[in-house]
Amino acid sequence: MATEQFSGVTLTTKANVYFDGKCVSHSFTLADGTKKSVGVVRPATLTFGTAAAEIMECVGGSCEYKLDGTDEWKTSTVGESFHIPANSKFDIRVTEAYHYICHYA
């Protein structure tokens, strides 16, 4: 089951806009200091880099992703997540709006 809401957060109101608007997210911090972002990727194939490790949780739509150093595309749908190591890259391929929560590890 996908996460539907968070309570007691501090939200950054200015959006993070990547790839000419193909990915838009908002960052927020939980009361315990945990940082996350919530966003949407519009249809495209994009490459993202990571500084911290990330867990991408699908809350709407679906995507295909390929981790750095692999040739295999995998699918993530609502309620599923995938892990990206710190200081890495991943490709994401979206054919319909993909809604996600990024959990920074």
Specify the residue positions occupied by each region the protein language model found:
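A short, N-terminal "cap"/entry segment at the start of jelly-roll beta-barrel domains
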Residues: 1-34
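Conserved short histidine dyad/triad with adjacent acidic residue
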Residues: 29-51, 81-86
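A generic structural motif
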Residues: 29-31, 66-68, 93
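Ligand-binding loop in jelly-roll beta-barrel domains
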Residues: 85-105
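Short, conserved beta-strand element in jelly-roll/cupin
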Residues: 50-65
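Short acidic-glycine-tyrosine-enriched beta hairpin
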Residues: 70-90
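Acidic, Ser/Thr/Pro
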Residues: 10, 20, 25, 38-42, ...
